[in-house]
Structures are given as structure tokens and as C-alpha cells.
């Protein structure tokens, strides 16, 4: 009897090859063309409030946002943009600013040339750039100004503000078809066409392909996946991914991660934003952290050292285990802005914080440095492993502080200016 063939993962398992797109330079950041997938974010301050906006852009940049979008919705906001750019430059923050325009972008960019110059990219929504006879004229004005100042644009269609004239046309054509599609499929087609037709018009006006980025955002995960698959199949423009109106808390994180994770695995996407509704008084930088963690978890980029920790169960002394895992995670994220320049390569560090002897020693050996805490009923001793080898055993009430000190020492010796080879990190017990 023949044995059935068993399908297994191989050492070549991974995402599909990246969809080949045209590289676009947004300030000093490359988007598309095989460049690393870029993390971006958006402020929620009143852009006219220069001080608050500068503070939030700075916080987002420190958290790791590589581009930051700001709303430019009225004259006071447009007038503030060059001052925001100036204040950021004085702080040494070179993160490109993207102007988000709706309805009157053509007028603001015309009337405030310093704003047009200070921004690194203009975001245009083809669904509300203008209405009826004014739409083409106002869209053309923005493209001509982008050409004048040498700025790229993102043409971003959105489910909630879709070009109704185009949608009505496609709905009528669908109704007359012998094999009509459902309304959602027609709406998805309108999204794709809105972006592609606008991009084609921009090129007719002299905008080169290497200054055009496209997006087509919806709030339903399956629709978003279908829209972006279609958009990628029909063009080679650089692509911005994002799930609009994802929501707050775990719902928003899960929805965005599910949608973007599938598309990224298929090789689609050159820059991403995780659009989260912040909790009242919440930290705006959470969206940056989630975007980084998504890319790092999937193996596309590394931003911070990875802390692996078991979920905990009845075998673990939960308080000690949880406190140490949280302490190490928070410490690493807080220190990363300084570590980036002081310890090149530290983002590749793997740390393991395990809760008991079942999987703890094995997982700790796979990390650069790991600890297996004593579980419930076990001896109060925690073996530490460095680069796969038993290093020493920590005991007593200061296990957490002692392990943190060992992590700091390991980072300094492994990634500091006088870095030693892994096996020379000092003195096992």
C-alpha cells in the first residue's frame, strides 16, 4: 500500500515575491520599487495649533513613523504648515509631512505656496476633490502645483466618499448587463477605476509615474483584500495599504492586521498605516507600534528586539512572570530611540521570558538571551541562557532586576562599539 504524500513546510516558506511597483521618493523616504515597506501615521491635532502638532509629529516620529500625514483643511492650517516644518527641522526631525486635502486643496495650495513647498507629498481624494464641472479643473490644479513643486501625490479613493458619478455609471451598466454582478462587486470596481482613472489623468497632465502612489480604502476586510488585489493586478503604481474606519482597541488592531497581513503575504503593499480610533486620552503612537509589530511578526522588517513570552497557565507564578515580561518589553521600546545609533543591529536581538520548565529552557535556548522562571511549586531558581548555552542561574527576590541587568550587559557587549563575539560574553556560573 502506497503511503499518502504529506505536504510539509520547507525552508523556503515565506511571503510571495513583492509586487513590482514604481519607486516614489517622498522627501528622503523611498516607497515602492522594492524598498522596505514604510510605516506611516496621521496626527489628530488641529494643524493650525503649531505647538500641539509639532509635539505629536515628534512623538510619532520617535515611535518609528517614517512619514506623518497632517490635515490641511482650511487657511489657518495651510498657514501653519511651514512653521510646523521649521520647528521639526530645528529639533532634528526630518520625517516627511504629507498634506491631507479634501474639497479645497486646490485653493489652499495656490494661496499658500509656503505650505505647498513645505509638504513632502499631497494626498488627494478623487471622490471629493471637486464636484460636477469643477472636479476635473480642481484636480488638474493640484496636479499642476505638484508638478511645479516637484511633489509626489497619493491618489486615495475611499469607500465613504466614492465618486458618485462614476459609481452611478457603473451601476447602470451593470443593471443592463446580461450577467449582472452584486452591488458590492460594482462598488469595488468603482473604487479601483476611480484610483486608476485619476492616476492616468495625472500622467496626462505631466505627472510622472514615479511621483504617484495609489490607495483604495474600505472598512470591510474582505472587500479591502479584493480591491487591493485588483488594483495591484491592473497597475504597477506604488501602493499604500490601510483599512479605513477600523475602529478602536482590539477590534481595530485585529481587523487591520487581518486585512493587511493577507495582502502583505501576497506581496502587495509598499507603505502601510494602521488606522486606529484612539481611546479617550490614549496614546496616538499605538498605531505606529502596531504597524511595526505587524511587519516584524511577518518577517518583513525588524524595528525592535523581539521579546518572546509564553501565555502563562496554571504552572506559572503569574505575577513574577508577567511583571518581568512587561518590564523587559517596555524597557526595550523606551530605549530604542537611543539604541538605534548606539547599538547598530540591536533590533535583531531576540529575548525570551518563559514561565516554567516545560517549554522554558527550550525556548530560551533559541533566543539570544532567555530566562526560564520557576513555575508554581518549582524551586525558586531561574536558569538564564545566552546564545543557546546555560549562562547562570538566578535566585532570590531580585530575579527580575538581575535579568534586566544581564540583558543590558549582553546588548552592550554584543552590539556596542567594543562588541565581542557571542561566545565571549562574560562568565557563566
Curated annotation (Swiss-Prot):
Q: What is this protein called?
A: 4-hydroxy-3-methylbut-2-en-1-yl diphosphate synthase (flavodoxin)
Q: What class of enzyme is it?
A: oxidoreductase
Gene Ontology molecular function terms on file: 4 iron, 4 sulfur cluster binding; 4-hydroxy-3-methylbut-2-en-1-yl diphosphate synthase activity (ferredoxin); 4-hydroxy-3-methylbut-2-enyl-diphosphate synthase activity (flavodoxin); iron ion binding
State the function annotated in the UniProt record: Converts 2C-methyl-D-erythritol 2,4-cyclodiphosphate (ME-2,4cPP) into 1-hydroxy-2-methyl-2-(E)-butenyl 4-diphosphate.
Catalytic function, reaction form: (2E)-4-hydroxy-3-methylbut-2-enyl diphosphate + oxidized [flavodoxin] + H2O + 2 H(+) = 2-C-methyl-D-erythritol 2,4-cyclic diphosphate + reduced [flavodoxin]
Biological process (GO) annotations held by this record are:
isopentenyl diphosphate biosynthetic process, methylerythritol 4-phosphate pathway; terpenoid biosynthetic process
Question: Which keywords does this Swiss-Prot/TrEMBL entry list?
Answer: 4Fe-4S, Iron, Iron-sulfur, Isoprene biosynthesis, Metal-binding, Oxidoreductase
PANTHER family recorded: 4-HYDROXY-3-METHYLBUT-2-EN-1-YL DIPHOSPHATE SYNTHASE, 4-HYDROXY-3-METHYLBUT-2-EN-1-YL DIPHOSPHATE SYNTHASE (FERREDOXIN), CHLOROPLASTIC
Superkingdom is Bacteria
How is its cofactor bound, per UniProt?
Binds 1 [4Fe-4S] cluster.
The gene from which this protein is expressed is: ispG
Task: Write out the similarity annotation.
Answer: Belongs to the IspG family.
Q: In which pathway does it act?
A: Isoprenoid biosynthesis; isopentenyl diphosphate biosynthesis via DXP pathway; isopentenyl diphosphate from 1-deoxy-D-xylulose 5-phosphate: step 5/6
Annotated binding of [4Fe-4S] cluster, by residue: 310, 313, 356, 363
Provide the cofactor list for this protein.
Answer: [4Fe-4S] cluster
Iron among keywords:
yes
One Pfam match, given by its short name, reads GcpE
Q: Which residues cross the membrane?
A: none
Amino acid at each position: 500500500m502506497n503511503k499518502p504524500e504529506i505536504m510539509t513546510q520547507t525552508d523556503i516558506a515565506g511571503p510571495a515575491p513583492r509586487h513590482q511597483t514604481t519607486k516614489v521618493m517622498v522627501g528622503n523616504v523611498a516607497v515602492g520599487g522594492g524598498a522596505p515597506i514604510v510605516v506611516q501615521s496621521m496626527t489628530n491635532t488641529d494643524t493650525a495649533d503649531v505647538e500641539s502638532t509639532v509635539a505629536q509629529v515628534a512623538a510619532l516620529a520617535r515611535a518609528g513613523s517614517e512619514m506623518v500625514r497632517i490635515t490641511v483643511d482650511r487657511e489657518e492650517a495651510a498657514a501653519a504648515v511651514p512653521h510646523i516644518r521649521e520647528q521639526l527641522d530645528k529639533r532634528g526631525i526630518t520625517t516627511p509631512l504629507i498634506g491631507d486635502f479634501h474639497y479645497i486643496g486646490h485653493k489652499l495650495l495656490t494661496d499658500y505656496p509656503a505650505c505647498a513647498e513645505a509638504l513632502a507629498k499631497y494626498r488627494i481624494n478623487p471622490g471629493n476633490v471637486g464636484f460636477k464641472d469643477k472636479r476635473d479643473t480642481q484636480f488638474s490644479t493640484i496636479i499642476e502645483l505638484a508638478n511645479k513643486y516637484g511633489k509626489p501625490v497619493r491618489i486615495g479613493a475611499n469607500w465613504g466618499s466614492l465618486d458618485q458619478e462614476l459609481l452611478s455609471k457603473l451601476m447602470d451598466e451593470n443593471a443592463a448587463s446580461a450577467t449582472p454582478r452584486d452591488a458590492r462587486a460594482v462598488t469595488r470596481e468603482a473604487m479601483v477605476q476611480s484610483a486608476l482613472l485619476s492616476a492616468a489623468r495625472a500622467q496626462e497632465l505631466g505627472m510622472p509615474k514615479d511621483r504617484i502612489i495609489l490607495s483604495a480604502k474600505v472598512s470591510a476586510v474582505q472587500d479591502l483584500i479584493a480591491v487591493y488585489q485588483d488594483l495591484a493586478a491592473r497597475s504597477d503604481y506604488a501602493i499604500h495599504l490601510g483599512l479605513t474606519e477600523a475602529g478602536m482597541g482590539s477590534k481595530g488592531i485585529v481587523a487591520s492586521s487581518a486585512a493587511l497581513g493577507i495582502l502583505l503575504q501576497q506581496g502587495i503593499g509598499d507603505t502601510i498605516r494602521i488606522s486606529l480610533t484612539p481611546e479617550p486620552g490614549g496614546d496616538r503612537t499605538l498605531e505606529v507600534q502596531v504597524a511595526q509589530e505587524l511587519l516584524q511578526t511577518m518577517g518583513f522588517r525588524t524595528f525592535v528586539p523581539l521579546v518572546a513570552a509564553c501565555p502563562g497557565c496554571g504552572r506559572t507564578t503569574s505575577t513574577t512572570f508577567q511583571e518581568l515580561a512587561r518590564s523587559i518589553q517596555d524597557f526595550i521600546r523606551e530605549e530604542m530611540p537611543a539604541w538605534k545609533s548606539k547599538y547598530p543591529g540591536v533590533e535583531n536581538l531576540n529575548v525570551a521570558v518563559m514561565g516554567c520548565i516545560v517549554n522554558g529552557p527550550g525556548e530560551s535556548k533559541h533566543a539570544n538571551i532567555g530566562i526560564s522562571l520557576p513555575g508554581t511549586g518549582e524551586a525558586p531558581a531561574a536558569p538564564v541562557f545566552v546564545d543557546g548555552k546555560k549562562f547562570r542561574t538566578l535566585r532570590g527576590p531580585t530575579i527580575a532586576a538581575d535579568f534586566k541587568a544581564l540583558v543590558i550587559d549582553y546588548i552592550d557587549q554584543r552590539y556596542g562599539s567594543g562588541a565581542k563575539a557571542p561566545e565571549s560574553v562574560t562568565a557563566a556560573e
